[in-house]
Amino acid sequence: MGDSGSRRCTLVSRLPIFRKSINRRHDSLPSSPSSSNTAGVHSSSPSSTNSSSGSTGKRRSIFRAPSISFHHKKGSEPKPEPTEQNLSISNGAQPSHSNMQKLSLEEHVKTRGRHSVGFSSSRSKKITRSLTEDFEREKEPSTNKNVFINCLSSGRSEGDDSGFTEEQSRRSIKQSTKKLLPKSFSSHYKFCKSVPQSQSTSLIQQPEFSLAIAQYQEQEAALGRPSPSCSVDVTERAGSSLQSPLLSADLTTAQTPSEFLALTEDSLSEADAFPKSGSTASHCDNFGHNDATSQPTSSLTAVSKTKMEFVGTAPCVMSPGRYRLEGRCSTELHSSPETPAGNRREVSLQSTELSVGNGSDPETHLPAHHQRGESPLAHAGEPALRTGSPRTLGSYDQHKALAERFKGVHPVSDSRVIPSSGDHVFNKTSYGYEASAAKVLASSLSPYREGRYIERRLRSSSEGTAGSSRMVLKPKDGHVEASSLRKHRTGSSSSKMNSLDVLNHLGSCELDEDDLMLDLEFLEEQNLQPPVCREDSCHSVMSCTAVLLSPVDPGKEVNMLEEPKCPEPSKQNLSLRITKDTDQEARCSHVSCMPNSPSADWPQQGVEENGGIDSLPFRLMLQECTAVKTLLLKMKRVLQESDVSPSSSTTSLPISPLTEEPLPFKDITRDECSMLRLQLKDRDELISQLQAELEKVQHLQKAFASRVDKSTQTELLGCDGLSLKRLEAVQGGRETTHRNRTMSQSHSTRDRKAIHTPTEDRFRYSTADQTSPYKNICQLPGLCLSNFLKDKELGGVMKHTRGNHEAVTSEMTQNSRTTMGQSFLKAAAKPEGLPMFSEKPKDPAALSRQHSTFTGRFGQPPRGPISLHTYSRKNVFLHHNLHTTEFQTLGQQDG
């Protein structure tokens, strides 16, 4: 139940909300979870945790929630009982207690997570409420200020962290905690909170530490799975490993009380002065702050994780050790604000290396810490911790404590160490990366830099989360996840730190699309600048280690409980050696500020200690994967370069040529279509021009016709008839008009008609010629040119006809009275025979109409539209008197 409870709570805590709140709640909650969890065991650790987390919680008014969660933990869980109870409970009651703790922790995290950073929650988990309250009271003013400052500093990034961390934790929680999440989130959340405590308690119960470790490993596996929620995961997983050590009298509690006291004190100074890495809580805060500052979101989440681990374990374990480490490690880690992140990394690395380097130490160290933890539970923790710690106190004790924190949670069961190794590798990697990242953090401390890396980290952390969810069942996965999250969160620096190392891990473990993409960015950098890929490689390494080690973890966890360090050290050595080589390489360059950092030296020791039997195959696998990745990336680049068009670039090589080939054809077709369209437009314009010209010519012809018939009124009628009939049928109307015109002319003066009929015939034929081209133009636009030429010819003909008309008009005016046109009239009437005779009956009416309508318009050619002349009083009256006699004569003749 403890495992499931812790996993559930981890899963729930992994939820972005819970993650955020858990990180902060763990910050504010430390005393609360600790007091409920470690009635006695955590009480020593709680003092410092409470001081930092309690002050944070109280300052943030979230501490009430921790107290509630403490009530949950205390009331619902037996864990609130002293550490001894926790020790006894750790195996049996721990599950429920851890579940309760997780519940309360999650509640605390919920209430408090947003405000407090993960370090507080891990502390709170590891500190008994009474101790927490005591330390709160003792150090609340300063510690709370420091913690609050740290929380605030980390809180700045927490806001960001909450976003990315939540997303990452959400992904990881969703992936890793889907199975457990179905259970009530609140319950899991509470269990998550209590489980870390119970895990700490079980770790506190280090006699049962193997079993507790198994449980904790399971819980941590659950926690580790949720570890994407960095605060809760790391807090819980680190809470298992960190909190558990802190809570557990074994590792952290013994150290935690004094360390937390020191942490609280140091945290006051450290929180105020980050360079003081002495207080892990402050370190965690600082880390949170630095990471949060440098990597507001991812860094903070990683910081929360790291903080949780460091706060949980590092504060306790590292407090004395870290005080000393602080002297050294804080110089190294706290060499710069980023150093806290680096410190985190280093602490993680140190703890990783401690756990790895002290693969066997964790057990001995755990018992020592366990003994120390129990004595620290009596607040002999600091003295005991420092007593036990002093030997390791420098970096070693911290590493031991960290190893215990990591391995302390899984120290006896180095199955845990495998997760721990995975975690340590990743912690070391993440912390080693973060150690480098710490340096990078100095520059990385800028939120901008983190923002850039945060995106990658988010992607990577989501990958890492996915990887962790893949590794969900492995506590190491949780640690790996947390480490990867830390790496990614600590972020840019971590990616810069050991990106090559991580890439190697990445390559061997999993080739994720994101990893490939990230490696695309960092592949060359990876070779040239390994840190750049650190993030991706961290995620990949996390995933890889989780994939490679996680399959072994479930069984190995139990087996490792029995055979705690045998398989794990090798795997730890695998990952640690790989990470160590890369980390040390990166550290040599990046951790130069922390050259003395045990993590830099210890990973190698741990790796060498645990032996690198598996490291070679693992490394070979990583190299092979990396080579494959490189080839794939090269292929991708070649494809991208070879592809001319973006669409072809997305397609595979065989497709791209095909895609390229059709493109020319399409272009050709498009060109042809455009050319054709242009031609059509030109032709249409030509047609319109020709039509306009034809209309003009027709108007001219009308004018000519009226001009030709100016001496006769019949021509005007003919023009009107033409205009009316032309609407109906151009040719037919024109011909009919000519016929009517001819008939009226014949009825008028035969001489005039004799002269005019040939003209009409000629004009009519020319008009027919014009009309036929017009039809052709309308029907066959393709013949525009030929039609245009024809129109030109017609224009010439029209001009010629115009001249003829003028000549005919002059002739008609001269010979208007001649009688020689009678024979011509007959000749003209013969071809038109039927129309003439058929229309003759209508002529009288037409003539009368003409007479009435066109009176006074005789003899003057119309200037402009016929209608104007028809209705022009001027024309009518001017010409009326002049032509009255002539008109009467014509009428008589027609009659």
Swiss-Prot record:
- Whether Metal-binding counts among this entry's keywords is no
Coiled-coil region(s): 675-705
Note the superkingdom of the native organism: Eukaryota
| Keywords (A to Z) from UniProt | Coiled coil
Q: Where is this region: Disordered?
A: 1-142, 154-177, 332-394, 459-497, 731-753
Q: Where is the composition biased (Low complexity)?
A: 43-56
Where does this protein have compositionally biased stretches of type Basic and acidic residues?
Answer: 131-142
Q: Is the keyword Coiled coil in the record?
A: yes
Q: Which residues cross the membrane?
A: none
Cysteine-cysteine disulfides: none
Q: Where is the composition biased (Polar residues)?
A: 83-102, 348-358
Cross-referenced InterPro entries, in alphabetical order?
Answer: CCSER
Q: Which family does it belong to?
A: Belongs to the CCSER family.
Q: What is this protein called?
A: Serine-rich coiled-coil domain-containing protein 1
In its UniProt entry, the species of origin is given as Mus musculus (Mouse)
